[in-house]
Amino acid sequence: INLKPTTGSMPPRLRIAINETEVFDGVIDQPKSIRHETESQDRLNITIHKTGKTKDVVDSKEPQEVLVDEVLLNGLSQHPDKFGVFNQTNNSYVKDQTTEGNEMALNGSWSFDVPVFRQEFVPELDRTQRDQFTDIGTACFGCSFTYGTFLDDNQTWPYHLGDAKNYGVGGNSISAIVGTAHWYVQNFKCDRLVMLLPHVCRLQLHDQHKGSWTFIPFLGDKFEGEAKEKVKDIVMFGEPSLLFSGYATRMKELLVEINEKTDLYITSYQPDTYDMLDKTMNGVCKILPFYEMSAEFEMASDNEHPGTEHNRIFANQIRPILGG
């Protein structure tokens, strides 16, 4: 938590709790960062009680404000300006009221409660893919952009690499892709492994009736029980960094293990995802250039997925980097 006060001669007192554990109780008169480590939980809850805005301070017209400048989980922003709520209470001259945001100008309590989107990275081995798992020079993992939806096999980017197998699965999430790739390197050999990853908002969910499946926002699917609540959270708190922060650490651990078995390369066709990978996975494995989908070239027949020329250009771009 990064805090920035603006105060006069009488600074405020703050009492801060993270998931009901008190982490700070004292006066704040200069910028302060508070770091707290805790076991993974399903939600991140922060409460900040602010006092000290006495009638004398109000009458002096001196400022006594605190800005919750940033809240980070695993190094990624949780957007306190969008999801914070301040309940101002016990103030001279003004009524109690609630405001949204990350500013505390009066006495009161600031609260912040967001879901933590953890992922289990379960391998999904029963999905439709172009090739059967086997030893190969280059193993390619991804979603429909790798599988080549609405394209023939020889129009996909893995085909253009040569000596490569296409293990892309339409509609896959990052966690399904990474989980399956992790399983693959435990059971097969490859000289290098390439992942083309989708948006971070695709999450692998579990249902006792459906098993493991991927939620893709705005497709209009119907959900029940726990999955319904998870989907509601994804829609309400859909900031990429907030979504990714819940599973980035576990993903990094799995990528390290994959990279110990083979040369690992990752990239994305989604700008948000590519930005998250660049911020969190540099040094863990090699990050390939962004997959561009230029309007200059014809799309697949559904006019949503990339066409053969997009794939050929991407393969030509990364082939010298992959070597072999």
Each predicted region: which residue ranges?
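A short beta-strand element within beta-rich, extracytoplasmic domains
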Residues: 1-8, 45-51, 55-60
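Alpha-helical cap/lid subdomain in secreted, periplasmic
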Residues: 182-324
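Short strand-turn-strand beta-turns centered on an Asx-Gly dipeptide
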Residues: 17-22, 73-75
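Exposed low-complexity, polar/acidic, P/S/T/G-rich flexible segments that act as propeptides
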Residues: 54-85
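Activation corresponds to long, low-complexity, non-globular regions
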Residues: 77-120
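Serine-esterase "nucleophile elbow" of acetyl-processing enzymes
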Residues: 121-187, 307, 313
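Short beta-strand/loop motifs in extracellular/secreted proteins, especially
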Residues: 10-14, 42-44, 67-69
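Extracellular carbohydrate recognition and processing domains
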Residues: 21-39, 87-92
